């Protein structure tokens, strides 16, 4: 595939006008960093019941970057849920029904954050203010 075909393909797939592709990619990169930061904070906090808060917060922060950030948050969230659908039964001993319910709740929190709603709705009592 030559370069021009690749660029046109990206514009069609990403749904971005040629005038905004640079901004979109910048927002997507920043959104990916927001998602990574929320994931790192979740691991650091290691706080029972806080995972939905971090899902919502990562998506919220990323989506605030703009369309590119919202796109990155959705792609990352969907990929994460797909991977967890495979690994959770193997490594956490979860049943398919448990995985399905957890994924549904995670996706609800993801969409909550991406839609601009306050992620603190999912914040558990006692989670340190640092987060």
Curated annotation (Swiss-Prot):
One of its GO terms (biological process) is acute-phase response. The keyword Secreted applies. Pfam families: SAA. Transmembrane segments: none annotated. Residues 1-18 form the signal peptide. Keywords: Acute phase, HDL, Secreted, Signal. The keyword Secreted applies. Gene3D superfamilies: Serum amyloid A protein. Induction: Up-regulated by Gram-negative bacterial lipopolysaccharide (LPS) and the Gram-positive bacterial lipoteichoic acid (LTA) in mammary epithelial cells and to a lesser extent by prolactin/PRL. Residues 94-131 are annotated as: Disordered. This is Serum amyloid A-3 protein. The gene is SAA3.
């Amino acid at each position: 595939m030559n370069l021009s075909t690749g660029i046109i393909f990206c514009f069609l797939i990403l749904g971005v006008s040629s005038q905004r592709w640079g901004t979109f990619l910048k927002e997507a990169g920043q959104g990916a960093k927001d998602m990574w930061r929320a994931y790192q904070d979740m691991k650091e906090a290691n706080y029972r019941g806080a995972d939905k808060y971090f899902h919502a917060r990562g998506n919220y922060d990323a989506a605030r970057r703009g369309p590119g950030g919202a796109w990155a948050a959705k792609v990352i969230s969907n990929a994460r849920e797909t991977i967890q659908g495979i690994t959770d039964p193997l490594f956490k001993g979860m049943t398919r029904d448990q995985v399905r319910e957890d994924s549904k709740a995670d996706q609800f929190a993801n969409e909550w954050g991406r839609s601009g709603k306050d992620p603190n709705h999912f914040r558990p009592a006692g989670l340190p203010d640092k987060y």
